[in-house]
A protein has these predicted regions:
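Class I Rossmann-like S-adenosyl-L-methionine
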Residues: 1-148
Length: 148
């Protein structure tokens, strides 16, 4: 799962920088990875689908931006797993911490661990604050929500 989280985070990071997701997945996973590619693809598509909400969750739990955008995206991938998959929370957190060590400096591990564990402890409160904003709740731009 650690490698899957890391690959999904790198693919999502590439998309946020302007790449197409299929090309980003091919670059980070390859074409013939079988079930592993399917899992990474699910994580990447799901994270992008809920990016507005996941980003708002991260912003609600930390006062300043995470310096390394890859780590911020990795946290979003792990939050997606915690909220939208049936994977055990302890496994998601553990693997995200290991993936952070592979992606960035060792200090990133403690940041990822702290954010994810805080989310698990304060889930209801954090989600209530985030869902109060329709942009975060629906993961759509404010202008689009205003038109609806």
């Amino acid at each position: 799962m650690q490698q899957s989280q890391r690959e999904a985070a790198l693919a999502v990071h590439a998309v946020l920088d302007g790449a197409a997701l299929p090309a980003a997945l091919e670059a980070h996973v390859g074409r013939d990875a079988g079930p592993a590619r399917a899992f990474v693809q699910e994580l990447a598509y799901g994270t992008l689908r809920h990016h507005g909400t996941l980003d708002a969750i991260v912003r609600a739990m930390i006062d300043r931006p995470i310096p390394d955008r890859r780590i911020a995206v990795l946290v979003e991938v792990a939050l997606y797993q915690l909220e939208h998959t049936r994977q055990p929370p302890f496994a998601v957190v553990d693997q995200a911490v290991a993936a952070a060590a592979a992606l960035a400096n060792p200090g990133a591990k403690s940041l990822v661990n702290a954010l994810l564990r805080r989310f698990l402890r304060e889930r209801a409160d954090v989600l209530a604050r985030v869902h109060a904003d329709p942009v975060a709740r629906w993961s759509h731009p404010r202008w689009w929500i205003a038109r609806l």
